[in-house]
Each structure stands twice: as C-alpha cells, then as structure tokens.
Amino acid sequence: MKVAIIQHVIRQDDLNWNLQHVSELMDKQAGADLFVLSETFATGFMAEGTADKAGMQGMMVLKWMQRQASRLNAAIAGSVATRDDDGKLRNRLYFVRPDGFFDHYDKRHLFSFAGETKEYVAGDRRVVVHWRGVSFLLQVCYDLRFPVFSRSRDDYDAIIYVANWPEPRRDVWQTLLKARALENQCYVIGVNRVGGDSACEYQGDSVILNAYGRAVAKCVPGKVDTAVALLDMYELHRFRQKFPVLADADDFLLASEQKFL
C-alpha cells in the first residue's frame, strides 16, 4: 500500500483555489494508492458564524473528491464541513474510492476552545474502512488527544489523523502521534496544514509513522510538501505476532456503544 501525504496551504473560504492547489500537489505523487489531505482542506477551519457557508459547499467538495479519486485511480481522505438532511453541520472525514463509493466518519471530539461545539454536532460512530488490503481507523484533529476512542481492538492496521493543528502545540501533535502508533502497534498517518489564518500559524509536521513509532515518511515542517511511504502489512503483522501487546489490552465498550447492547 503506497500512501501519499499532502501538506498544503489553505486559503480561508477560497474553495476553488484550495482545490486546484491540492490537485497539483496530488499529481506529484501520482501512482499512490491513497492520498491523505488535511482537516477542512477546501475551506479552512470555520469560525463561529461562518460554518453555514461551508455546509453548503460540502456536496461540491465530495463530488470533487470523487472525480479526483477516479482520475488518479486511488482513494482520497480529507475532511469537509457538511450539512445533513437534519440541518445540522458535521466535520466529516470522507474516504472516497475511485468508483465513487465512499465511507465517512464524523468528528467525535469537537474543539470547544475554538467554538466548534457551537457550530457542529459530534459524531458517535467509530469507523474503520478497508482499502486494497489495509484497514484504516478514521480520526480528525482533536480526536488525537483522546486515546480511548482510537484504542485498537485488533481491527485496523493504520490510523488516519487529518488536522488543523496550530504551531504553538506542535510538540503535542508529534508526541501523541507517536504514542498512538506505539500503544496500538499500528501505522499512524498524520496530515496537518501549513500557512496561517486569522487565529494562528500551522507548521504541518505531517508524517507517517510505523508501529515502532519511527517516521517512514515526513514532510518538511512549515513548507508545502508531499511525501510517500509503503505500508508493509507483512512486517506489521509479523511484529504484532512476535510482540503481542494487544492480547493483554483491557476490554472496554465506549458509552455510545452501550445503546446497542
């Protein structure tokens, strides 16, 4: 599995420019099986009072992802602000395949510090997707701080984190990505934006870590960049069998799962 991480600038609310920018960067890694973009890659993180506009653009962005996935014969992962039939906004991570079919995960942990809880509804589903022999757990930005929600049940090979993670907390980003890889014995794909907006600057630090917590691909911090890595499933499963930490993990159910019992 060849995974390309796309570390890109986001112009706030400039949908057409952002989509063209990302498309050009993806072309540099043509041949990848999966392209991972940032959180809200087409618009930027929406502040209070502006998310309604982004919600109207959600379907446009999804259709663009479907066209790009078909053109590149690859899956594409990235989050957008979207409005469902219930009228509520969600920070939705789409995983789109070349045939147009897609899965989605709605961000579970909303960033109340930045007002996300005032605009969006939190998701309640834990989502694992399967693509070309690899299983991915989908996560968005702030979810990284809550390890119980991403705890492995031996049901995925890699975690995808897409983010708008600010530069002042870059050490947290780097530390927690490594922790998630080590504790879950999995690959971790973390993609963050670069540039700035009215709130802060973003350093990127996009990376792919293996189950040993070592970087197998990384983008240049603070720069528009792309990187690619091969996910080696044979080596991952060999490591898990040789050092079976997950067999000793605690059993648990998330609160949202109790209602299904």
Predicted regions and their residues:
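Short beta->alpha transition motifs characteristic of CBS
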Residues: 43, 50, 94, 105-111, ...
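Extreme N-terminal starter segment of soluble prokaryotic enzymes
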Residues: 1-5
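Short polar catalytic/cofactor-binding loops
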Residues: 7-13
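C-terminal beta-strand edge segments of enzyme domains
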Residues: 128-130, 193-261
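CN hydrolase (nitrilase-like) catalytic-core segments centered on the catalytic cysteine
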Residues: 61-77, 145-226
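Active-site catalytic loop in hydrolytic enzyme cores
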Residues: 84-154, 168-175, 238-245, 255
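Cys-nucleophile CN-hydrolase/nitrilase-fold catalytic domain and related Cys-dependent amidase chemistry
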Residues: 15, 23-98, 167-186
